[in-house]
């Protein structure tokens, strides 16, 4: 486990340095106590906090969802919040499922399949079945990463359906495990600093799969229905129950603005946020704890049919107190999102309009005109804030000093 010792300094050339020490890396991270520039702090002798860590202990984030439910898009939004593009390991297996950015490493839990595609077919199990996955290895390796140790992680090749040779994964600042089972095994679940579940309703999932598999892959409607029905028992048994453990759930439902809509193009999206989670304060609309319905369409927000409706209020979810923010409808102009952003609180933004900026930056991503993109972006900002508060606590410095 990482050992961090804070001490004070009046000046330093670099805000973060790496110093060789007895065969391991020693990181020094500097936290300034005021928002003024580093130069003015030094000039006036203001104290800064310098934190020396023998090994940086990553925070671990879990993201659970069924296949084809937007995990990859969410990861692209999340890594963008922290800066730097997420790319496969350089010089590694071209079919690797891992993505690495400046601060974040994302691994796909499909890599812990214990059976290849042929093996699953022979045994009559799906990839959703725990019997087709190695949870002991998953736990051991996630635990090792959290302790700051490198691992040799297996690779499941989605192209060939085979188990490829392992790849070396170094501990990052933020380690994200995404896939079918991040919260299934209690041992793995307890390693998570924060967890998210993407809950796509059956109606929307079916509409999305038809759009993707018929239009892009040439599958018949009958084969799509058969595929969904074949997976449903295992999904209901092993994947869906994980949402009760998630700290935040993004639930995607059919719109209520269009009667009997079954196309899945206009969506109603809920951000369900647990109360009482350390370092996580739920986002709220207008007045925290109140029950509010808001139709923002008008002079400051362009809305074509069927319009936009926001709702917010307290609720219970699997017996736990939650706050729920809901958006039904879609944006016509993303630049006008700033009007909505200005009425939301606890966003954990660095500056006014950061949510809107992130949404405009990735306007071509799926869901950018509705609540899926908006709430994924907000959760990404909340995870950044959570990371900063965790490292501040570990270093023994004020939380404000860790803001970057």
Swiss-Prot record:
The keyword Plastid applies. GO terms for cellular component: chloroplast; cytoplasm. SUPFAM superfamilies: P-loop containing nucleoside triphosphate hydrolases. It catalyses: D-ribulose 5-phosphate + ATP = D-ribulose 1,5-bisphosphate + ADP + H(+). Keywords: ATP-binding, Calvin cycle, Chloroplast, Disulfide bond, Kinase, Nucleotide-binding, Photosynthesis, Plastid, Transferase, Transit peptide. GO terms for molecular function: ATP binding; phosphoribulokinase activity. Pfam families: PRK. Light regulated via thioredoxin by reversible oxidation/reduction of sulfhydryl/disulfide groups. It is an enzyme of class 2 (transferase). GO terms for biological process: reductive pentose-phosphate cycle. CDD domains: PRK (cd02026). Residues 1-53 form a transit peptide. Pathway: Carbohydrate biosynthesis; Calvin cycle. Belongs to the phosphoribulokinase family. NCBIfam families: PRK07429.1. This is Phosphoribulokinase, chloroplastic. The lineage of its organism: Eukaryota, Viridiplantae, Streptophyta, Embryophyta, Tracheophyta.
């Amino acid at each position: 486990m990482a050992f961090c010792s804070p001490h004070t300094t009046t000046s330093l050339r670099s805000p973060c340095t790496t110093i060789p020490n007895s065969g391991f890396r020693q990181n020094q991270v500097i936290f300034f106590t005021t928002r003024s520039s580093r130069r003015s702090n030094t000039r006036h002798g203001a104290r800064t906090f310098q934190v020396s860590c023998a090994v940086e202990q990553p925070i671990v984030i879990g993201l659970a969802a069924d296949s084809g439910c937007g995990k990859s898009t969410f990861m692209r939004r999340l890594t963008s919040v922290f800066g730097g593009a997420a790319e496969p390991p350089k010089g590694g297996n071209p079919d690797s499922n891992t993505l690495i950015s400046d601060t974040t490493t994302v691994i796909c839990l499909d890599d812990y399949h214990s059976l290849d595609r042929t093996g699953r077919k022979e045994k009559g199990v799906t990839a959703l079945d725990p019997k087709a996955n190695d949870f002991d290895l998953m736990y051991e390796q996630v635990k090792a990463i959290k302790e700051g140790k490198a691992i040799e992680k297996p690779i499941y090749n989605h192209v060939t359906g085979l188990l490829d040779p392992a790849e070396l994964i170094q501990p990052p600042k933020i380690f994200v495990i995404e896939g079918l089972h991040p919260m299934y095994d209690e041992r793995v679940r307890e390693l998570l600093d924060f967890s998210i579940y993407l809950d796509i309703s059956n109606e929307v999932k079916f509409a999305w799969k038809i759009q993707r598999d018929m239009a892009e892959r040439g599958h018949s409607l009958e084969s799509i229905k058969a595929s969904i029905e074949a997976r449903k028992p295992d999904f209901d048994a092993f994947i869906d129950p994980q949402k009760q453990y998630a700290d935040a759930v993004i639930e995607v439902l059919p719109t209520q603005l269009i009667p009997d809509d079954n196309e899945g193009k206009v969506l109603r999206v809920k951000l369900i946020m647990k109360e009482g989670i350390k370092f996580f304060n739920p986002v709220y609309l207008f007045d925290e704890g109140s029950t509010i319905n808001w139709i923002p369409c008008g002079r400051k927000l362009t809305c074509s049919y069927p319009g936009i409706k926001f709702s917010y209020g307290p609720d219970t979810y699997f017996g736990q107190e939650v706050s729920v923010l809901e958006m039904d409808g879609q944006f016509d102009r993303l630049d006008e999102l700033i009007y909505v952003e200005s009425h939301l609180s606890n966003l954990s933004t660095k500056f006014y309009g950061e949510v809107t900026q992130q949404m405009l930056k990735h306007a071509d991503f799926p869901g950018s005109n509705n609540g899926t993109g908006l709430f994924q972006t907000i959760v990404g900002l909340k995870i950044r804030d959570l990371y900063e508060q965790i490292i501040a606590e570990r270093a023994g410095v004020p939380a404000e000093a860790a803001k970057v």
